[in-house]
Amino acid sequence: MKKYIFIILSTLLITACNTNNNRQYVIGVSQCSEDIWRDKLNNELVMSTYQHDNATLKFASANDNDKLQTEQINQFIKEGVDLLIVSPNQIHTISSVIDKAYDKGIPVILFDRKTDSKKYTAFIGADNYEVGHEMGHFIAQQLKGEGRIAEISGLKGSSPAIERNRGFMDALKAFPGIKVVSRRYADWLKQKGEDEMDSIITRDMPISYVFAQNDRMAIGALQATEKHKIKGIKIVGIDALPVPGGGMESVRDGRLEASYIYPTRGDLVMQLALNILEKRPYKRDNYLKGALVTRDNANVLLMQNEEMNKQTARLTNLHGKVDTYLAQYNHQKVYIFLFSIITLLLIGIMVYVYRTIVIRRRIEEEATNAKLQFFTNISHELRTPLTLIADPVEYIINDKNLNPQQRNMLQIVERNVAVLSQLVSEILDFRKVQNG
C-alpha cells in the first residue's frame, strides 16, 4: 500500500510541477530615450510576449543620457539577464559597457542604432543611409534639381544622425543645382527643432525645403515658420508615426510635405532574440524596410493603422481574459492537487489505523488464548491432585474402624477438597465468559 501511495504522490507532483518545460528567459531592453516611436516599439515587444510566453522583458530608458544608460546596462549585467536589446545613445560613449556585456557571454542585439564596436550579436533596424538617400532624392525631384535646403539633424554623434546625413548628401551629389545652406543639430527634440529653425530663418534665408531627421523636429520647424508667418518653405521628416499629431497625420493634413516610415517591428526584434537564445539560425545584420509617405498614401495608411489598432486592442483584451482564465485554472490545479494529497493521506491513515486494529486484535486473541491455555493447564494440574485426594478420603471415611476424631479430620479434608474443586471450576467458567 505504501508503495502505491508513493507512486500516486510522485505522479501528482510531476504533473503539478511540469506545467511548462520551456526555459524562461529574461531580456533587458535599454532605450536611449523616451518618445512616441520608442513607446510603439516597447508595446510591440510586449505584444510579442503574448505569443512567446517564455520571455520576460525588463525596460530601462536613459532619457538621452549616456552615463545613465551605462549605469542601466551595468545593472542588467549585474542582474544576469539572458539577452540585451540596446539602442545606444551615441556611437562612442556606450561602446565600452556593451563590450563588457558581450565579453561576459550575454548576447547583445543593437536596435535602431549602432556603436563603433563589432562586439554585438546582431543588429536590427532600418537602413538609415537608405532613409536619408530616399529623402534627398525626393526633395531633389520636388525642386527639379535646383534650390536651397536646410537640414536639421538629430543628436550629434548618434549613428542615425550620421548615416541619414550621409545618405542625404550622397543623393544630392547628382543635383549640383541644389545647395545645403545650413545643417543644425536639434537632438531629436521638437522644441530644439523650433529653436534651430528660428536661427535658420534669421540667418540662412531664403530656403525652399527643410529636411528634419525626425517628425518631432519637423513639426518644431513648422511651428517656427508659422510663428514668423513665413510661407512657401516645405518641410519633410522621418518616422511617419500614425498617432494623433504625428508625422503621418501632419502629411495627410498638408502641414508636412512628406515623411518616411521608420519601422519598429518589435515582433521581429523579439523573434531575433529568441532565435539567438534558443540556438536557432539568424542573420547578424537585419535591415527593416520603410516607405515614403506623401499626401497620396497617408490617408490609406492611417485607415490601415486604425484597423490594426482595433485588432490590437481586441488581442490585448483577449490576452487579459486568457491570463485571468489561466490564473483561475492554475489555482484550481493547486486546489485539486492539495485535495488529492489530503485524500491520499486520509486513505493512508485509515489503512494504517485498520492494520493497527487488526494487529492489536490478533495480539489480544493470542494473549487470550494463552491465558485460557494457562488456566486450562492449571485447572488440570489442580484437579488431578484434588481428585487423587478426594477418592481415597471418601474411601477411608467409610471405614468403620475409624474413631470419631479421625473421621472428623477426614471430613474436614473432604470439604476443603470440594471447596478447592468448586473454586477451580468457577475460575475456568469466569475466563470462558470473559473471553466470549
Identify the function of each model-found stretch.
Residues 325, 329-332, 336, 346, ...:
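Heptad-repeat alpha-helical coiled-coil signal-transmission segments
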